[in-house]
Structures are given as structure tokens and as C-alpha cells.
Regions:
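Active-site-proximal, substrate-binding regions of enzyme catalytic domains
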Residues: 2-35, 45-47, 51-56, 62-82, ...
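Gly/serine-rich nucleotide phosphate-binding loop at the start of the catalytic core
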Residues: 41-42
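Active-site proximal loops enriched in glycine and acidic residues that flank catalytic Cys/His/Asp
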Residues: 387-389
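Hydrophobic, helix-forming membrane-interacting segments
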Residues: 559-586
């Protein structure tokens, strides 16, 4: 837990230095000086790298450290003797005490962050037992890899997504996240000169998964679309750099195109169905948005045509080089990625066997395009696959796939690429800040993703009940109505604020709510019927009274018994109206 706190503190300090207009090398140099001071001895290059990791959990490429050390030698801060580095003025601790002070200050801040999250969890679920050490570790994982599923992930995301809680604490977390973004930009860096001038010596082809392609046009919601737009801005900026030999190419596999076409074909089959059938068939935002406004199958065909036209306009093109056919060629078997052990590990995490087959095919195709070479910088490996599927991302880090820590992974996230491209193009974090850098926005996306997954599981469970005829027709109708209500809440822009959507028994809660409303409506209908009877009798008495008025204009005669009855009816009428309105308001 202590190393976790140190790393988070160092990230915040990294961002602190960056805000002081220090360039990346100057910031790294400060940490190197602090490392050399603490070691009390001369260090070889590899030892400097090791101590940077031991002291701050910074995994910085050797080439970058070496360049930073050379700059320190030129500025007379460090000397090199027999390939070992040491501080020239080790006694002058004040010059590099800011790191120590900042990290110590953050220990208090870190405690405040954890306590705020614990308080939030207790507020929304008082029965939940929070293990502080587990929460600290999960918070660390959330900052460094928000795609990893952990015990407290949904609570951390809910805390950050909620606009009403601890804005000062969230600002501190944002500072940590910004530091992590800066460090991410240094990952898989071989040529230190590329930190200052972004060079592409050859094309880098980024293959994009179906879900992200849907995000590009807004099928998954406006927030996802905005993040993809940030990605496009950075790609276009890189491609406009003069004298670059290579370009960033955005492509999708023919297999991905087939999946997209099948998706639209499914939408064609759904669009003309009844509303109940649509509820039974639609379980994600993309399908809901494709169906929105569509009445006939031809409307879906038109949307599909417009979608592929949109991709072409953004220069996102199909790669029809028949990579899949090449990977099954016996001459390319060495690039196939598969072992029984990695399959077992994949299935043990609760994943589907069919997904394993699809994912290993993607990994193998990228490996084939790279010709099996994943060492070096990201820009020089030639290809990478972009996805938001956590199961595929985890598989790409399996030890049988990702053999060396320095290897560039075959698959990554759009967040990583945005971080990388933003860093490499030296965008100032205050002038151009991609939406994915905002921890509150990212948290909302994570919460919505968790809610959508819960809804999908709920949908699958209900579908299974339908197929197996496990329940009566009335029960099924009631569950479908409940499912529709939940679906509307899930697709709402503020779904992340609805904590009940996380409940495992959300369907039962919604059904009970519907039943309760039905009973209330029945009661109100009974009241309304009583009012109708009272109004009818009152109307009859009024007519009789008017008749008496006409019969005897000088003297209005109403029998005492009828007058009493009329007064009683007036009272009953007024009292029932009050009860009627009261029940509606309640």
C-alpha cells in the first residue's frame, strides 16, 4: 500500500512541475537528481532506471533517462565517471527537496481522498463493509488502468461522476490523473529526440473495433463521440506535420465490416416489430440509436449507407488486404497466437469460448502485420488494434502474448492513444485538453458502461425465461414493461446519478413499483367512481331545486330531509375531491 501512495504522490508532483512550465526532460531530471541524492553513491544507467522505479514507480525508458542524464552533465549538475553517475553538489539538498516536500504533503491528501470515497460509499450503501487497504489498491488501479475490473471500481467511478461531492478532492485526483497522462506519453519510447519533435519514419496503421467506429458517429452517445473527435483532431495534427515520412492511417478489418453489416441487418429485422418485441430485442445504446426515427427497413439501409459514408469522409477505410486469409496460410503459422494455457486463463475469468476464438484471430492478424516484431517504439511497430473490450485488452497482456514488458502491446485503448498523441505533439494541457483527460467525464462513461452491462445481463436472463417458458404470460408482460422502464433510465444522460441501476435486484424493484402504482390507480379509479355517483345525485337535487324555484318564485321550499341529504352530498363530494388530489400528489 505504501508503494501505491508513493506512486500516486509522484504523479501529482510530476504534474506540479509541469504546471511550472518545466519541459519533460527537466521534470525527469529533478527525479533523477533526487534519486542520486538518496542513493548516496554513484549509479550505473540501469541502476538509475531501477531506483526511479523503486522510489517512485516510474518505468521510464533507458533512452529517455540517458538523454536526461546527458543534459544534467552539460548543466554541471551531474558527473559521469567510469559509466557511473553522481551528483556534483550532493550537499545542496534544497535544490531538489521539492519532490520530498510534495510527496510528503500528498500523504495527507491521499488520506483525504480515500476517506472521502469511503464516506461516499457508506452514504449510498450503509451496509457495505469497506476494506480500506483494498480500496487504496483499487484506487491506484483505477488511476493507472480504468479498464481493469476491481471490487471498488464502480464506487470510485460513482464518486467521481457525482457532481455534488468534494470538488476539491476531485481536483486533487485530477492532478494525479494528469501526471499519469504525462508519464503514459513516455511509454514505449526508444528515440529520445521524438519527445521534442514527433517523427514518423513509416506509416502507423491503427485498426479500429466496431464499438469505437459506432462511437465515432455517436451511436454510443455524445460523450463517446466527443472523445473520438479528440482522437481524430490529434491524428490529423500528426498527419499535417511537415517532413514526416509516415502517416497515421485509420483502418478497420474486413471482418469488422461484416460484423457491422450483420448488426445493421439485425436492426432491419427489428424495426418493423411491435414495441414489446423491440424491448425484447434491443439491449444496448447503439441499437437503440440506429432504430431511433426508423420506421421501415429502408430507413435502416439508408442509415447503414450514411454510416460507411461518414467513415470514408473521416478517412477511416476498410483494409481489404485479406489479412485473415493470410493468417490461416501455412507459411504464416508462426504469427498465430494461441496456447491452451492462455485459453484456460481466459475462460477462468468468466469469458466466452467464442470470444477467445475471435480475439486470438485479431491478435494474430496484428502480429502478422508486424511480422512478429513488437519491440521498439510504438510508432515503429507499424500496427495496433484499438478497442474498448476489457476481455480483449486483458488477453493482449497474457504472458503467452506479451512476453516482454518493453514490447508494444498488440491491442490498446483510445485513451492510451489520445494520451500518447497529445504528449508527442506537445499539446499544452491548458490549451487543448481532450475530453478523455477529464476524470469526471471518464467516470460517467465507466458508470454508464457498468450500468449497460448490468442491463445486458438482465436482458439475457429475461430472454432465457421467455425461451424456456418458465413464467406466465402476465408475469412476462410485467417484466417486459419493467425492462422498458429500466431501459429508458439506462439510456438517460444522467444514468450515472441513478444508484438503483447498480442493484442486482433492479428488475424486482421495478416490478414491485409497477404493481404498487397499479394498486394506487385502482384505488383512484374507485374514488373516481364514487365521485361520479355523488355528482350524479347532486345534479339531480339541483334540478329538483331549480324546478321548485320555478314552481314557487316567492318561496323556495325544500324538504328538511332533502336539504340535509344535499348538504351531506356536498360534504362527501368535497372530501373525496380532497382525498383524490392528496393521493395523486403522494
Amino acid at each position: 500500500m505504501e508503494s501505491t501512495k508513493v506512486y500516486l504522490a509522484s504523479l501529482a508532483t510530476f504534474k506540479f512541475f509541469y504546471d511550472k512550465d518545466m519541459d519533460i526532460y527537466s521534470i525527469i531530471s529533478e527525479f533523477i537528481k533526487d534519486t542520486l541524492y538518496k542513493s548516496k553513491e554513484s549509479l550505473e544507467l540501469e541502476k538509475v532506471k531501477k531506483y526511479l522505479y523503486d522510489n517512485y514507480n516510474f518505468d521510464i525508458p533507458l533512452s529517455v533517462i540517458k538523454t536526461a542524464l546527458n543534459k544534467l552533465i552539460q548543466s554541471s549538475n551531474v558527473e559521469r565517471l567510469e559509466n557511473k553517475y553522481s551528483l556534483i553538489s550532493a550537499d545542496d539538498i534544497r535544490r531538489f527537496s521539492e519532490i520530498e516536500i510534495s510527496n510528503n504533503d500528498f500523504s495527507v491528501t491521499h488520506q483525504k481522498i480515500i476517506e472521502s470515497i469511503m464516506s461516499f460509499i457508506t452514504k449510498i450503501d450503509s451496509s457495505y463493509n469497506v476494506v480500506k487497504e483494498d480500496l487504496v489498491n483499487d484506487f491506484f488501479k483505477y488511476i493507472t488502468n480504468s479498464y481493469e475490473d476491481t471490487k471498488y471500481k464502480k464506487y470510485i467511478a460513482m464518486f467521481l461522476a457525482n457532481d455534488n461531492d468534494s470538488s476539491k478532492v476531485k481536483d486533487l485526483i485530477q492532478q494525479i490523473k494528469d501526471g499519469e497522462i504525462l508519464l503514459t506519453g513516455l511509454s514505449y519510447q526508444q528515440d529520445p529526440n521524438e519527445i521534442e519533435i514527433y517523427k514518423l519514419r513509416k506509416n502507423l496503421t491503427i485498426y479500429i473495433d466496431q464499438e469505437l467506429l459506432f462511437s465515432s458517429i455517436g451511436y454510443n452517445g455524445e460523450l463517446y463521440k466527443e472523445i473520438f473527435n479528440d482522437f481524430l483532431i490529434l491524428v490529423n495534427g500528426i498527419n499535417n506535420i511537415r517532413n514526416n515520412k509516415g502517416k497515421v492511417l485509420l483502418r478497420y478489418f474486413s471482418e469488422t465490416k461484416k460484423d457491422i453489416e450483420n448488426y445493421f441487418y439485425a436492426a432491419e429485422n427489428i424495426v418493423t416489430r411491435s414495441e414489446i418485441d423491440k424491448i425484447r430485442s434491443v439491449k444496448n445504446n447503439a441499437m437503440r440509436n440506429i432504430l431511433t426515427g426508423a420506421i421501415e427497413k429502408s430507413d435502416i439501409v439508408s442509415k447503414k449507407s450514411n454510416f460507411f459514408k461518414f467513415l470514408r469522409e473521416k478517412n477511416i477505410l476498410e483494409d481489404d488486404s485479406e489479412t485473415f486469409e493470410s493468417i490461416i496460410n501455412k507459411n504464416n503459422y508462426q504469427f498465430n497466437i494461441y496456447t491452451d494455457e492462455m485459453k484456460d486463463r481466459f475462460l477462468l475469468r468468466g469469458n466466452e469460448e467464442n470470444d477467445f476464438s475471435n480475439y486470438t484471430r485479431i491478435l494474430s492478424m496484428i502480429n502478422l502485420i508486424r511480422k512478429g516484431k513488437s519491440s521498439g517504439s510504438l510508432e515503429n511497430v507499424g500496427a495496433i488494434f484499438l478497442t474498448a473490450k476489457s476481455a480483449l485488452l486483458n488477453l493482449s497482456w497474457d504472458p503467452d502474448v506479451h512476453e516482454k514488458d518493453t514490447d508494444v502491446p498488440l491491442v490498446t485503448t483510445i485513451d492510451f492513444m489520445i494520451n500518447r498523441f497529445w504528449f508527442k505533439t506537445q499539446k499544452n494541457i491548458t490549451n487543448f485538453k481532450p475530453r478523455s483527460f477529464d476524470i469526471a467525464l471518464q467516470a460517467k462513461l465507466i458508470v454508464n458502461s457498468i450500468i449497460n452491462n448490468n442491463f445486458t445481463h438482465l436482458f439475457d436472463r429475461l430472454k432465457n425465461d421467455l425461451n424456456n417458458n418458465k413464467k406466465s404470460e402476465n408475469d412476462i408482460k410485467l417484466e417486459l414493461i419493467a425492462l422498458r422502464n429500466i431501459s429508458e433510465r439506462v439510456s438517460s444522460c444522467s444514468a450515472y446519478e441513478d444508484f438503483t441501476l447498480f442493484n442486482d435486484d433492479i428488475l424486482e424493484i421495478e416490478i414491485n413499483k409497477i404493481k404498487s402504482n397499479e394498486k394506487r390507480l385502482e384505488y383512484l379509479e374507485d374514488i373516481n367512481n364514487e365521485l361520479s355517483v355523488v355528482k350524479s345525485e347532486l345534479s339531480s337535487l339541483e334540478k329538483e331545486n331549480n324546478q321548485l324555484k320555478n314552481d314557487n318564485k316567492d318561496k323556495i321550499i325544500i324538504s328538511k330531509s332533502k336539504l340535509k341529504k344535499r348538504n351531506i352530498l356536498y360534504f362527501a363530494y368535497g372530501n373525496n375531491i380532497f382525498n383524490y388530489i392528496f393521493n395523486i400528489l403522494m
